[in-house]
């Protein structure tokens, strides 16, 4: 028996068409939140983990989508929960009724995240680079350091 070492083959790079498709799917995974409430960030993370070694473009776009969706999911949920709790407590003294319109508006803010994710999906499908405001540079720096 010989002493042979086997190494895994180098990952096969994605074609530009496949890169655009997977980047688009990562951004559009935000739509999964409409049905499941949580699957969007999971889908974007899975895409990142599967394709990070095969395409820096897909890695960047999918990690951006994951971070963006996670921030929106946690942040918007916490803010809406607090707004409704304050409104509910204060409604006992009628001041809360004044807070309810604000709580309703805050409840609809996650729709902006859906629209932003769709814009990202459309732009990446067209082959354009998409960068989420405030998140994109941080993700790019994180990937560069890795």
What are these regions (language model features)?
Residues 23-43, 66-117:
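Hydrophobic alpha-helical transmembrane segments in multi-pass membrane proteins
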Residues 2-70, 119-146:
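Membrane-interface extramembranous regions at the lipid-water interface
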């Amino acid at each position: 028996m010989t002493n042979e070492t086997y190494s895994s083959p180098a990952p096969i790079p994605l074609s530009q068409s496949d890169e655009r498709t997977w980047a688009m799917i990562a951004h559009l995974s935000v739509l999964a939140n409409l049905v499941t409430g949580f699957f969007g960030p999971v889908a974007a993370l899975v895409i990142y983990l599967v394709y990070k070694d095969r395409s820096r473009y897909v890695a960047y776009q999918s990690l951006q989508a994951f971070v963006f969706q996670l921030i929106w999911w946690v942040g918007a949920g916490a803010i809406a929960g607090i707004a409704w709790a304050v409104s509910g407590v204060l409604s006992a003294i009628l001041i809360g009724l004044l807070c309810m319109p604000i709580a309703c508006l805050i409840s609809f803010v996650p729709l902006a995240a859906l629209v932003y994710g769709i814009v990202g999906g459309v732009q990446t499908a067209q082959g354009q680079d998409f960068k989420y405001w405030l998140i994109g540079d941080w993700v790019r720096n994180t990937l560069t350091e890795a």
